[in-house]
From Swiss-Prot:
Highest classification ranks of the organism: Archaea, Methanobacteriati, Methanobacteriota, Thermococci, Thermococcales
UniProt-listed NCBIfam families: PRK13130.1
UniProt protein name: Ribosome biogenesis protein Nop10
Assigned GO CC terms: ribonucleoprotein complex
Gene field: nop10
Keyword Oxidoreductase: no
Similarity section: Belongs to the NOP10 family.
Functional summary from the UniProt entry: Involved in ribosome biogenesis; more specifically in 18S rRNA pseudouridylation and in cleavage of pre-rRNA.
rRNA processing keyword on record: yes
UniProt cross-references to InterPro entries, sorted A to Z: H/ACA_rnp_Nop10, H/ACA_rnp_Nop10_sf, Nop10_arc-typ
GO molecular function, one term: snoRNA binding
Pfam families referenced in this protein's UniProt entry, alphabetically: Nop10p
Amino acid sequence: MRFRIRKCPSCGRYTLKETCPVCGTKTKIAHPPRFSPEDPYGEYRRRLKREQLGIVKR
């Protein structure tokens, strides 16, 4: 069994549980995804980020 530290997005506390023991919000894994030079979804992720920030690609 492998434990990953998790972080509550609302209060910012770290825990190993699925829900925050302080506020009850669902926690998220605090680690970034693994890096891969052959990133199969990189193009889509960058496009989504540009759309969210309102950047127009020229």
